[in-house]
Amino acid sequence: MRIDILTLFPEMFAPLEHSIVGKARDKGLLEINYHNFRENAEKARHVDDEPYGGGQGMLLLAQPIFDTMDSIEQTKPRVILLDPAGRTFNQAYAEELAQEEQLIFICGHYEGYDERIKTLVTDEISLGDYVLTGGELAAMTMIDATVRLIPEVIGKEVSHTDDSFSSGLLEYPQYTRPYEYRGMVVPDVLMSGHHENIRKWRLEESLRKTYQRRPDLLENYNFTAEELTIFEKIKAEDTVD
């Protein structure tokens, strides 16, 4: 995968040189290019101006963004504008982006964008219902969530297919050594070696956690017959409590 990032602050992306994303680059599975669009600004390197019609703040000029985009080698990329008004990013979106050959992120600053910039864009994405100073932190979050889903980036595919949200449910509780710590012990089923019982326990705990913490995820969830039986049991237990 190739990722191009338009930003005024390339140095903010230093963390992408490390961890999973850095390893993906070392393996040749990922190429990341940074483009400081201030370098393409025409008037005294200014990248922003006051909005027509008045109003607070400054807007990013269209010209530096367009000229920078013209300089990037493109192979039918998804062009992503980081915008609080955009579609909310989630795991399903990350899985969708992981299938692409090229992603381009446009990171804004200041009050907003000249609307004409959006003619370059295929996706407007937000991390949530809040506003950040710029798009860089949002872009790094999306890149990390997406890159780890690229085949061969993580050693075992199960490492991410069992993640919270990948199945549509939150992940079940997990434990490691020691068996007992400060009076807290590992559930006996996990020590039993009985793989089918362990699978059923994990499924039940995953459904329980999702029901208790993120019931909204279950509104459109396609239950299997087994899951539905377990879920009805969980709801009945909750009613009794």
Swiss-Prot record:
Organism superkingdom: Bacteria
Key words, A-Z: Cytoplasm, Methyltransferase, S-adenosyl-L-methionine, Transferase, tRNA processing
Molecular functions per Gene Ontology: tRNA (guanine(37)-N1)-methyltransferase activity
Binding residues for S-adenosyl-L-methionine: 108, 127-132
Signal peptide segment: none
Documented EC number(s): 2.1.1.228
InterPro entries in UniProt: Alpha/beta_knot_MTases (IPR029028), tRNA_m1G_MeTrfase_C_sf (IPR023148), tRNA_m1G_MeTrfase_TrmD (IPR002649), tRNA_m1G_MTases_N (IPR029026), tRNA_MeTrfase_TRMD/TRM10 (IPR016009)
Catalytic activity field: guanosine(37) in tRNA + S-adenosyl-L-methionine = N(1)-methylguanosine(37) in tRNA + S-adenosyl-L-homocysteine + H(+)
Subcellular location: Cytoplasm
Record keyword tRNA processing present: yes
Biological process terms in GO annotation: tRNA N1-guanine methylation
Enzyme class: transferase
Annotated Pfam families: tRNA_m1G_MT
Primary residence: cytoplasm
Family: Belongs to the RNA methyltransferase TrmD family.
Subunit structure of this chain's protein: Homodimer.
Name of the protein in its database record: tRNA (guanine-N(1)-)-methyltransferase
Natural source organism: Streptococcus suis (strain 05ZYH33)
Gene that encodes it: trmD
